[in-house]
């Protein structure tokens, strides 16, 4: 797993190469409002044209971090000649298109980007493979035994506690009830819920609630 510092160091040292674009690091950790800061300023150059971007860096490529990055960049009071850019380890083609629709540029460590200087140039690159797969404790929570946690939200879209979810899952698991198989543990349920929050499937506030099926 990479860190934000390591990512910004690569940007600072000119190691982010996304032809036909070239990048020049200008500054980092600057205030842009009363309580807002940006991680870096960079120049993106294409042929003889260049544009300046305010970069928000996220070290995890989860839907939650992606959406948080978009929301933060949209909230910044940037000058008219500085444009927002999200920097993540990996950006999928779908995410690049979403950024483009929001008027936000994006670059990653896998060779993908959408960089837009309105009215001057637009560069879209996709297809670079994800070199930073999920480090979640359970690699795919939507398969095999752990998928029962997600299916539990189709029965009840809102739970008070993790214990309630675990009880619902184990009550509906015929292998537990008929064959005395080991019930799902509380720690497994918690790990699955953590990933579901990062994937923006559920939210955990006062209750644990389904956001989208």
Segment roles from a protein language model:
Residues 103-115:
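Charged, structured surface patches that assemble and position nucleic-acid processing machinery
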Residues 1-31:
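Acidic-basic catalytic patches of nuclease active cores, encompassing PD-(D/E)XK
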Residues 146-213:
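Loop-centered beta-sheet repeat module
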Residues 36-77, 85-86:
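Conserved catalytic cores of phosphodiester-cleaving nucleases, focusing on short active-site segments
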């Amino acid at each position: 797993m990479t860190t934000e510092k390591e990512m910004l160091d690569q940007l600072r040292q000119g190691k982010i190469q996304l032809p036909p674009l070239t990048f020049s690091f200008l500054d980092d950790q600057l205030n842009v409002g009363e309580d807002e800061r940006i991680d870096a300023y960079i120049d993106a150059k294409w042929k003889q044209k260049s544009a300046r971007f305010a970069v928000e860096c996220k070290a995890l490529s989860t839907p939650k971090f992606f959406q948080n990055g978009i929301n933060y960049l949209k909230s910044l009071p940037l000058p008219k000649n500085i444009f927002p850019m999200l920097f993540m380890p990996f950006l999928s083609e779908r995410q690049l298109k979403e950024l483009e629709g929001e008027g936000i540029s994006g670059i990653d460590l896998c060779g993908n980007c959408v960089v837009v200087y309105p009215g001057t140039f637009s560069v879209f690159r996709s297809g670079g493979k994800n070199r930073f797969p999920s480090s979640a404790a359970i690699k795919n929570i939507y398969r095999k035994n752990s998928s029962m946690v997600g299916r539990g939200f189709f029965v009840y879209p809102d739970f008070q506690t993790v214990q309630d979810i675990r009880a619902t899952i184990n009550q509906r698991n015929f292998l537990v009830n008929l064959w005395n198989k080991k019930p799902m543990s509380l720690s497994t349920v918690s790990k699955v819920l953590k990933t579901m929050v990062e994937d923006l499937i559920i939210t955990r506030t006062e209750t644990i609630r389904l956001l989208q099926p």
